[in-house]
Every structure is written in C-alpha cells, then in structure tokens.
Amino acid sequence: MTLTRRDLIKAQAAATAAAAAGLPVSALAQPVTGGAEALRIRWSKAPCRFCGTGCGVMVGTRDGQVVATHGDTQAEVNRGLNCVKGYFLSKIMYGEDRLTTPLLRMKDGVYHKEGEFAPVSWDEAFDVMAAQAKRVLKEKGPKAVGMFGSGQWTIWEGYAASKLMRAGFRSNNLDPNARHCMASAATAFMRTFGMDEPMGCYDDFEAADAFVLWGSNMAEMHPILWSRLTDRRLSHEHVRVAVLSTFTHRSMDLADTPIIFRPGTDLAILNYIAHHIISTGRVNRDFVDRHTNFALGATDIGYGLRPEHQLQLAAKGAADAGAMTPTDFETFAALVSEYTLEKAAEISGVEPALLEELAELYADPDRKVMSLWTMGFNQHVRGVWANHMVYNLHLLTGKISEPGNSPFSLTGQPSACGTAREVGTFAHRLPADMVVTNPEHRAHAEEIWKLPAGLLPDWVGAHAVEQDRKLHDGEINFYWVQVNNNMQAAPNIDQETYPGYRNPENFIVVSDAYPTVTGRCADLVLPAAMWVEKEGAYGNAERRTHFWHQLVEAPGEARSDLWQLMEFSKRFTTDEVWPEEILSAAPAYRGKTLFEVLFANGSVDRFPASDVNPDHANHEAALFGFYPQKGLFEEYAAFGRGHGHDLAPFDTYHEVRGLRWPVVEGEETRWRYREGFDPYVKPGEGLRFYGKPDGRAVILGVPYEPPAESPDEEFGFWLVTGRVLEHWHSGSMTLRVPELYKAFPGAVCFMHPEDARSRGLNRGSEVRVISRRGEIRTRLETRGRNRMPRGVVFVPWFDASQLINKVTLDANDPISRQTDFKKCAVKIEAV
C-alpha cells in the first residue's frame, strides 16, 4: 500500500510512543525522507544486502521497481546511517546485463561441454541438470556430487540446500564461501566455548573502555560499526583504540596505539600479552579457577596443502592437527613465558613500547576491552590458534560476557552467521551447532526431517579448497554453485580451480544474478532473483535474525535460489538416489520424489499460501501452493529451541528489526553465558559456558609458527589481498553501480614509494605481480588510503580484469580449513 499523509502522521506517532516505552517499532512506523514525492513511494524494512553488520534499511518501491533506500532510523544496528555501498542499494539489481533466462552450453542443439551458451527453458535446463546428476550418482555415488553455497543465502535457502544435499543426495559435499571468511572463528568458538558465535553484541561499543582491532580495517569494511566505535572514542577521553595490521590503513587514523607487524607474527604478540598478564600478577584467578580449563594444542600441523606437498610431508602433527591435550595453568604459563617483550618485538618487528602499551590495555583490571577481528585473523594458516589466543586474554582476565568486555568476531557476509553457521551449511555441520559425525545429532535431524533412520551420511564432506581439488582430480563430477563467485574468490585459481570447472568429466551449474567469471566457466547458468525480489532472512554478527518481504518481481525468468532447489528436487525419486537397504527398511518412502520427502512432508508445507502477508507477493508460495519460507523456518527452528539457539516464531520477525538469539519467552539475549542476561544461566550460577558439559571454557596453549610461504631472494615481497570501501567481494554487484565504479574503477597494487623508486617505478606504472603460481598485470599506487611498509604490497580482489587469486597460495588452516589470502611471496616487475 502507498502511505497517505494521515498514515504517515499515525505511524510516526506510534513510533514515538513505542520508542519511549522501549518496544519494537513496526516497519510502517518510520520517518519518510524525501518530502511529498516520497509519500507516493511504498516503504518497507529490510536488512542491507552487503556485509555482516546487518544494517537496517527502508526500501522504497514504485511501479514494481526499487527506486530508493535510506537508513532505517529505528534499526538498533545503524540508527539510520548507511555506508556508501548501502547508500546505493537501490541500484544493485538494475545492471544492464542481469541474467533473465537459463543458459546452457550447446552444440548442434544439444548440451556439449565445449559448446556456446544458448538460452533454454527452465524445463530443459533442469532436464539436462538432473540427467547429469543421476549419471554421476549412478556411476560414482554421493561422494561425486557437490555444492558450493554462500553466506549470502537466505536462512531458508541454505536450509533447503542442506536438506537436498544431505538427505536427498546423501552427500555432505556441501560447503559455503564462508569457509573462506569465518571458518576459523567458528571453529575456535566451538573448541573454546562449545557453541558458535559471539557472546556479546553491538551494545558493547557503547560500554568498552578500549578497542583492539586485530587484522580488521573497520573504517572501510564495517564503517557503520566504526562510526559507533569512533563516537565512543571521541566522546570519552579515557577510551583507547589499538589497531594492529600489516600495513597502515584508514582505521589507523583513530588509533592511540598503531601497530604494524610482520605478516603472521600476531601469534607471537598474543602470547606475549598472555605472558605479560601472568608475569605482572593480573590474572583473575577466581574467574580462571571457576570457569576455565587449560589445554595444549598439537603443533607442527602443516598448512592444508595437498598431501604430497613437501611442507605437508614434513609436518609431524598434521595427522591430528586439532588435537588438544588437557594441562594446567603452570604448563600454560611456562609456554607463554618464552614470549618475552624482547622476543615478541624481535619476531614481529614492533617497537617494545607499543607492545607493552597494548598489553596493558588487557592487563588493567579496571579497563573493559572489546577485541575485534575479521579476515586478518581468520584468513590465516593459524587462524584457529589466533582466535584461541585472543580468547585466552579475555579468559585470563575475566573480561568476557558482560557489557564492554567482549571478544567479538566480525563477519563479512550478510548471513555468514545466520545461514552458513547457524543453519549449518558447512561440510561437517547440521543446524544449531550439531555435526554430521555425531550419531545422536544425525538421528535428531532424521526425526525433525521425517526421514528413515540411518539415511544421513556420517562422513565429513569436502571443504571449499578440497572441493576445487576434487573437481580438478575428477573425484567430484556434478557441482552446483549458488550465490558466490568462486572462480574469482578461490585461491590459486589457475592451477586448481579453473582446471576443475573445465574438466570434461564434470558438469558445473552456477546460479547467479549477473554474468561472472564463475558463470563463464560453467556448463549451465541459472538466473537468480536478488535481495528483495524474494522473501528472505539473514542473521548478522551479533546473532540478530532479520526478515524482509518480497517487494518487487525478479526480471524475466530469474528465480530465487529457494525455488531452484525445491523445483529441482521434483526431478528425483527416492528409488533413484537412496540405497536399497534404506528403502527396504522403510518401504513407505518408495517412489516418492525428493520434493515430497523433503518439502511436502507435512512440516514444511503445513502453512498455507494464504498466510503470506496480503500486501506482499511471494513467488514461491504462489507456485508451490504453500508458504515454504515459513514452513522451512519453523522446521529449522525446532533444532535450536530449548538448546540455547532459540528463535522467535516466524511471524514475529516481520514485525521487528531483528532479534538476537536465544529468544526465550519473547525476550532476546544481548550477553550470553552471564546471569541476568542469559536465560540459560540459572540464578546463583553467575557465569556458565553451557556449551561445554562442565560449563568451563578452554584456554589453549599454542606457539608461534611461521607462514607457509615467506619472501625470499627471488620473490621478495609479501602479498596481502582484501577489500576496499567502495566494493564488496568480487564486485559483481558494486561494479554495476555507476557511482561506485567511478569512485574506484579498477584494482591497483599499493606499494611503499621507496620500494617503487628502487625498482625504477612510479605511481601509475604498469607492473606484473608474479608468484610461483601465476601472475597479473596492474598499476602501482604509492599514495592514498593504504600506506605500505617496505616489502609488503596490497592488491584488492574485486576486479575481474585483474584476478589476483591467480597469484595466491591455496594454503589453509589445517583445523578450520580456511584459506590464507593474507600471506604469500611475490615479485614485482615492470611491464
């Protein structure tokens, strides 16, 4: 409906009253920007499409098109602010080259691996796709099919994909691109606390006395949260900010303690801080004795490379990289005592005075500390260790699970938490922190999903890098990519990724809204609906689940990923994909389609299409005859309710600006594990890390170990990759926004001016960035936002014309299997 002036006055009055009472504010009760003209625009709430901050926006539609967006003034996360990408959200869906019909490689009228792309109908696309999947399943079985998903999937899209892969095709070869960004954080949360995701929330920004950024350029990558941090720093004189990075960036402008360290040496710095806390007598012994256990981690664990690589062959602890051996405080203290101030300074290249200043922020018992990190920590061959080490500091001092004391892992995708982690679309996970290797967890999933006992596979599937290797080696032959641009985002793409996509044994499907590098390497491209062209839900970094309605129609024949997954499932019967022993034991399932078993199962289809808000369209409900988003969400929510992952009823989320789980009796949780905030902590317990059977968190002792590859005489520079403010990930959306394209049209190589001069190069010189794996051409930048130390260069990865991941190394953390995009050796040569 369109807002009239009377509607607007009533809505704003309601908003004022609700805000005064501390109540959630409805989506209608919003100030409307733009004057009288805006009153002819229909406004609805949604979370932003970009990063994991989870900003709320108001989306304005008119005549079936998104015509404007503005920051949602009632959203707690951003309070009406947008970053530059959020400001241009209304343009991301309207690039001239939107995909509007399926495209199949064809020659002489039939599918051919070496054919040219030609438009086909959805029926023809699914016919060929199903035939290829059935061929592979029949010839090689479930381990030869795979899927690569996304932290940009909506919650129900990821959930439907997990059901189709695990229960339908009986394959755990399902992984999200969040493997490249959040796996180390998730793994360390589980190992330390027994549950995933931060215990704190964004309210910590208004309560902390110190902020320490570890490998996080928040000023560009999380600018809205940076604005909250900046406000706290500038309005309270006692607040301090420390920023640690391998080069100087915009977040350094606010730093009281700016620290530039050698790549990979943050591990030594972290152990030094732990030693400083212990040696100066600032351990909170009461907290440590009551709430923690100590362990030692396996060492010399390798670098996640192919088994035949010399570094893997030499690694003595690679066979059990995640092993943890119980120990005591004294043994832990002895380990970190080796990391004296002098040794940490020598390893890291940081001035001792700065390290001591940093350590005091954590050691001071009267100072509340919020640690913040993202890719610099997680994209690290010892990323799990780095995450553990920062938890060590908070646990040793008791600075955790209360306002202002918060180790906080930031996320880069809008639902890396809500979908990849909470739904469990990793190769080893099920919903609500359950895992495929646990027979009780599998049985629980089979019960909720109404499946025959013993159906779900017990083996851990291939992770992201391993999927590329298995495609390369012909071990995965049917592969579906949704909502990611893996051919641009994966490491070492020339040697590992591209050969797998073009392997003649393999059939590659890509679902996307725009042509991408990945799509150009596929055999079948399916046009996808974007953002508010479908009803959706995301979960952000502070455990906030946020819904939106479908507001416009997708162009042409583009369809949501949810529709694609559900519709494709109709092409298979249980007799074609399940083993005979399962069907013999459960004959009632014979002859049923996977759609009937997984989606028309009396649970997902129990809500009629008439439940859809009559003011909004729902393409999937109209086609399937029931409300699949509601059914999938309520079925999924059953995994977590009563188990510390409680979600509110489906309809509640359409009325509020998101709620932070666990949501118990209508109340969200801001700080987990702490009495008075968390309903799962009983009166008198004070604090309990209830993810662990004994309620205790783990303090892990591990050493500094060097990166997989370092500069040498031939390859004399460290290469760091990452993002810039104006573009998001591979640029497939932001490069199609004219204003963002003009602001930063192409990638450059940031270099120290003295390094350039010593090679006879200048700002703007065309150069080759060369590694042992590949090379690109780009131009030098010796000024501007990123100021490099000698011997380090930075190249962003958003530019498809400069595929910097031809150069990167496919080393990954042996525990989390997250890729290290921050450290490899390159040489720079003039063209």
Curated annotation (Swiss-Prot):
E.C. number = 1.9.6.1
Residue sites binding [4Fe-4S] cluster per the record: 48, 51, 55, 83
Q: Has the keyword Isomerase been applied to this entry?
A: no
According to the entry, every stretch annotated as the 4Fe-4S Mo/W bis-MGD-type domain falls at 41-97
Residues bound to substrate: 797
| GO biological process assignments | cellular respiration; Mo-molybdopterin cofactor biosynthetic process; nitrate assimilation
**What reaction does this catalyse?**
2 Fe(II)-[cytochrome] + nitrate + 2 H(+) = 2 Fe(III)-[cytochrome] + nitrite + H2O
Cellular component GO terms, alphabetical: membrane; nitrate reductase complex; periplasmic space
Please name the PROSITE patterns in this protein's record.
4FE4S_MOW_BIS_MGD, MOLYBDOPTERIN_PROK_1, TAT
> Coiled-coil regions in this chain?
none
SUPFAM superfamilies this protein is in? ADC-like, Formate dehydrogenase/DMSO reductase, domains 1-3
Keywords assigned by UniProt?
4Fe-4S, Electron transport, Iron, Iron-sulfur, Metal-binding, Molybdenum, Nitrate assimilation, Oxidoreductase, Periplasm, Plasmid, Signal, Transport
Q: What is the induction comment?
A: Nitrate reductase activity can be induced by nitrate and not repressed by ammonium or oxygen.
Co-factor: note: Binds 1 [4Fe-4S] cluster. Binds 1 molybdenum-bis(molybdopterin guanine dinucleotide) (Mo-bis-MGD) cofactor per subunit.
Q: Which residues form the signal peptide?
A: 1-29
> What is the recorded post-translational modification?
Predicted to be exported by the Tat system. The position of the signal peptide cleavage has not been experimentally proven.
Tell me which CDD domains the record gives: MopB_CT_Nitrate-R-NapA-like, MopB_Nitrate-R-NapA-like
**Positions annotated to bind Mo-bis(molybdopterin guanine dinucleotide):** 85, 152, 177, 181, 214-221, 245-249, 264-266, 375, 379, 485, 511-512, 534, 561, 721-730, 805, 822
Q: Which GO terms describe its molecular function?
A: 4 iron, 4 sulfur cluster binding; electron transfer activity; iron ion binding; molybdenum ion binding; molybdopterin cofactor binding; nitrate reductase (cytochrome) activity
Which cofactor is recorded for it? Answer: [4Fe-4S] cluster; Mo-bis(molybdopterin guanine dinucleotide)
Q: Where in the cell is it found?
A: Periplasm
**What functional role does this protein have?**
Catalytic subunit of the periplasmic nitrate reductase complex NapAB. Receives electrons from NapB and catalyzes the reduction of nitrate to nitrite.
Into which family does the record put it?
Belongs to the prokaryotic molybdopterin-containing oxidoreductase family. NasA/NapA/NarB subfamily.
Q: Which HAMAP family match?
A: Nitrate_reduct_NapA
Q: Could you give the subunit structure recorded for this chain?
A: Component of the periplasmic nitrate reductase NapAB complex composed of NapA and NapB.
Protein known as: Periplasmic nitrate reductase
User: Species name for this entry?
Assistant: Cereibacter sphaeroides (strain ATCC 17023 / DSM 158 / JCM 6121 / CCUG 31486 / LMG 2827 / NBRC 12203 / NCIMB 8253 / ATH 2.4.1.) (Rhodobacter sphaeroides)
